[in-house]
Amino acid sequence: MADLQFTKGQGTGNDFVLFADPAGEIDLTDTQVQALCDRHFGIGADGTIRAVLSSRIPEGRAALDEDPDAEWFMDYRNVDGSPAEMCGNGIRVFTLFLIENGLIELPPGRTVPIGTRAGVRDVQRSGSGFQVDLGRWALAGGEPLVRAKDLQVARPGLGIDVGNPHVVVALSSEDELAEADLAFAPQLDPEPAEGANVELVVPADPLIVDGVGHITMRVHERGSGETLSCGTGAAAAALAIRHWAGAAAPHQWRVQLPGGVLGVRMFPTEDGEHVGLSGPAELVFDGVVALA
């Protein structure tokens, strides 16, 4: 039975067990991930994040082909042990973990490329947290019908890809949002082959204040269940509401989640429109746990 040195971290309540494995020698089983994330018998988290040198694993070497400066790879695993392409909250906490453990230097205002299964993502340190360029986004997955427990009727959703798949559903009120039981995975028709995160979103009234769009949301994450926050989900929700609102909709958004507030912005680049995410990150405590 080996010991694992870990750090518990969180971003707007989306929490993770992080550990450094530069040489790529610690390959957790699905059962071990589930045990670490168990909130009653383990540490408790929405997922695990391994910091591994990109050169030491195949997915990381693919990131180096994209950007030779992407020295570190974020190996994210969901509660059930399945690998995830990307985590918008996780990558901010991951970057802070690298800084605090002396694995990188990143003064405020500077940017570091991080390898993920969705490709390389650039993370900039700011005075109050981190900003992440999530890259190009796309309408993907069509408009499946979404059935969520305790919502009376099926609702049309909108498929959005921001490096991982999402389906966004607009609701009419915060009361309706509160009624939904996201302990159960919403049912999608048709069901995406790889599954999807599902966001239930309520636009504010008024929607736009001082040029910034405002929305409130909850999320059920594929492989993890309902979480207090989902960074890529916040980006997908803002993109969907902007799409539905039309040409007059803003490119800056404030997204209220149960765990806090995230900022989302859309901006042009040479390879198309990108979406960015901003928010806090915190390392909560360090520890050692025995791996079964």
From Swiss-Prot:
Annotated positions binding substrate: 14, 78, 88-89, 164, 197, 221-222, 231-232
Compartments it resides in: Cytoplasm
Keywords: Amino-acid biosynthesis, Cytoplasm, Isomerase, Lysine biosynthesis
Catalytic activity: (2S,6S)-2,6-diaminopimelate = meso-2,6-diaminopimelate
Positions of the record's site feature: Could be important to modulate the pK values of the two catalytic cysteine residues: 166, 221
Gene Ontology CC entries for this record: cytosol
UniProt-recorded Gene Ontology molecular function terms: diaminopimelate epimerase activity
Xref: InterPro entries: DAP_epimerase_AS, DAP_epimerase_DapF
EC number: 5.1.1.7
Primary localization class, coarse: cytoplasm
GO biological process: lysine biosynthetic process via diaminopimelate
Residue spans crossing the bilayer: none
Pathway note: Amino-acid biosynthesis; L-lysine biosynthesis via DAP pathway; DL-2,6-diaminopimelate from LL-2,6-diaminopimelate: step 1/1
A matching Pfam family: DAP_epimerase
Protein family per UniProt: Belongs to the diaminopimelate epimerase family.
Described purpose of this protein according to its UniProt entry: Catalyzes the stereoinversion of LL-2,6-diaminopimelate (L,L-DAP) to meso-diaminopimelate (meso-DAP), a precursor of L-lysine and an essential component of the bacterial peptidoglycan.
Protein name (record): Diaminopimelate epimerase
